[in-house]
Amino acid sequence: MKSATTIFNEWVKKNKDDGMQKTHTPAVMDMLQYSLSPLHTTFSFIDAGCGNGWVVRYMNNQSMCETAIGVDGAIEMINKAKRLDTEGQYILSDLMDYKPKKKVDLVLSMEVFYYFSNPSKLLNHIKEHWLRSKGRLIIGVDYYKENQGCHNWSENVGTPMKMLSRKDWVDIFITSGLSNIKHWLSCPNNDFIGTLVITGTVS
C-alpha cells in the first residue's frame, strides 16, 4: 500500500482534488455554520489537511477571519493551493510535526483523521499545540464503521485507513479532555447515512 500523501499527490495530477472539493463542500459548510454562528469577534483558523486550499480561500473571504492557514502533507496539494492563491498561507508539513507560531480559535479537518494510525495522538497534538483556550476542533469523517459503503475504501484506494465506529470517534474526543463535545451525521441522503461530525472545545 502507498502512503496517503503519495495517493493525494497522484490525485492532484488527475484533478481528483476538484471532485473531493465538490463532494466535501456540503458537510464542510455545515461544520463551519455550526462553528462560526456563535462567534461575534475576529478569529483565526487552520484547515488540517487543506488539500488544494479551497476552505482557506473561503475563510479568507469571511470578514471576521483575521488569519487562515492551510496545512497538508502532500506537496502537490500545497503547490496547487499556492498556485490558486498566491497570497494565502499554505504549509507543507505532516500534521503531527506542525506547530503554529500562534495558537488559533478554530481548527477544521475534513476527511483526514482516519489516515493516521493513531487519531487520538493527532487530536491531542492539535489540542495542545494548535488551539487557544476556548478554541474549537471540528472534524468530519466519511470512513466509519456504521457507513457500510466505505468498508472497501482502503483496499480500493490502496492506502491504510483507520476504521472506527461512531462511538470510538466520540470516545477519542472525550478521552482527550475536550469539552462541550457534540456529534451528528451531516448531509445524509438516500445513498449515504451522512458525514460523521465531531467537535469539542478547549477548556
Regions found by a protein language model. Give the residues of each.
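Short, glycine-/aromatic-enriched active-site segment of Class I SAM-dependent methyltransferases
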Residues: D142-P160
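Conserved S-adenosyl-L-methionine
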Residues: L178-N189
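Short alpha-helix
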Residues: M161-S176
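A conserved beta-strand element that flanks and buttresses the S-adenosyl-L-methionine
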Residues: L108
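A short glycine-rich, Lys/Arg-flanked "PGG" loop and its adjoining helix->strand segment in the class I
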Residues: S120-K134
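Conserved class I S-adenosyl-L-methionine
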Residues: M1-P38, K145
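Class I SAM-dependent methyltransferase SAM/SAH-binding core
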Residues: I46-A48, N52-D97
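Conserved beta-strand signature within the Rossmann-like core of class I S-adenosyl-L-methionine
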Residues: K134-D142
